[in-house]
Amino acid sequence: AALVAACGGSDSNDSTTPPVASQPATATLAVLETTDLHFNVRSYDYFKLAEDASYGFERTATLVRAARKEFANTLLVDNGDTIQGTALADYEAEVAKIPCTQQLSMYKAMGALGFDAGTLGNHEFNYGLPFLNQVLGGGLDVDGVDKALKCAGNGFPMALSNVYSSKTKQPLVQPYVILERKIAAKDKDGKAVELPIKIGVIGFTTPGIMNWDKRYLEGKLYTEGAVESAQKYLPEMRAKGADVVVAMLHGGLDGAAYSPTMENPGLHLSKVAGIDAMVMGHQHSVFPDAAATPAFTQAGVDNKAGTINGVQSVMASSWGKALGVIQLALKWDGKQWSVDKSAGKSELRNIQTGKDAAGKATYVAVDPTVAPLIESQHQAAIQYVKTPIGSTDFRMSTLFADVGDPGAIQIVNQAQRDYVADYVKASLPQYAQLPVLSVSAPFKSGFQGGADYTDVAVGPLAIYNAADLYLYPNTVYAVKV
């Protein structure tokens, strides 16, 4: 765990320091969340080689700056699934690996905003532990990893409480951080005062990492349930003086009975005493949800109040489409802080602002400081994905994938089947006569919006077409049945 001294997250140049109050006062702390950015720094589709204003951190950044102008006190956190998801991510991890002395483009862009804390999602483990160690700056004490490595790092504190090193039996990274701040408040007469506060931030991720990245993690890491980790560390955080505790859960909501291996334990985690606010993710959904049929309706979920079992909560979509904002109403009694749960508020601020006269969606402008930071890497990734790899004599599409057998899935199944058949013939000849069946899923079938489909025309193929057919760096597994 760590105790970090930090100044308030504001873009203001006002250096006035009001007097400290020993009398009652009130303040608002705005917790700002990004989640599941998946390396979408730019509003750009590397699979179509085209701009796409419907997502991108460069637009979320605009919302962050606006929120910092609105609120005197902010805490900006990232909820994981940050370093994987685009061709640029794969380029920096596997094609032209980013050197130790440089930050990942995603982290470099985030540095322009000054994040206060973050946690790890399941996709942070997709490239293996040595790479994760490098991009976090070194220090992971795990078998097969150089703990002494000193690299550029991510630029903000990481906290994760429920993933442990098998080597040390200690958390992979610090389980929580406690940020010491000066917070702008008002006394009972409305006079501006400045008061000290300690903000605790604790992280949790889904135990599913041990299945999804088994080849990298087995024997090196193990997980604990989010509830068990919270019960262990929350009292410790309070004992160290945390006035407010924010839980970063890379997981969402599931109404099933609790299990330590539960993928989305938000409903159960919210019941652990000591959590004042909870930011969620992983499910690429939204909370609170103003839709007529909201995604989450389990007992304890209040979409109107933005609470989960009374805890102010948000889930800010994915790919930078929204910023989660939790307003915590704080009370100072002259000696310590408390949270007024009756006055809290949770909301999503979307980058989509509405529609124009023609019915076309409109979006907030990009933050002009972001794109120049990664321009050279952005262009390098584009050139890489343009590399020719062959041609196709049939259209490969996921249009209507939910009701048929599309060409884009057929080609993936054919490739998987041929790969496994060749492997079995060469390495497991005793099974060479067995038929090989393949199963694949349409990764792009409209979930992320109207343009979220694969549609590769007849003709030449490049790397970006192959990446469009299969988005993730998954591993092929064959099971004898």
Question: How would you label these PLM feature ranges?
Answer:
Residues 18-348, 411-419, 427:
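Acidic, metal/ion-coordinating pockets
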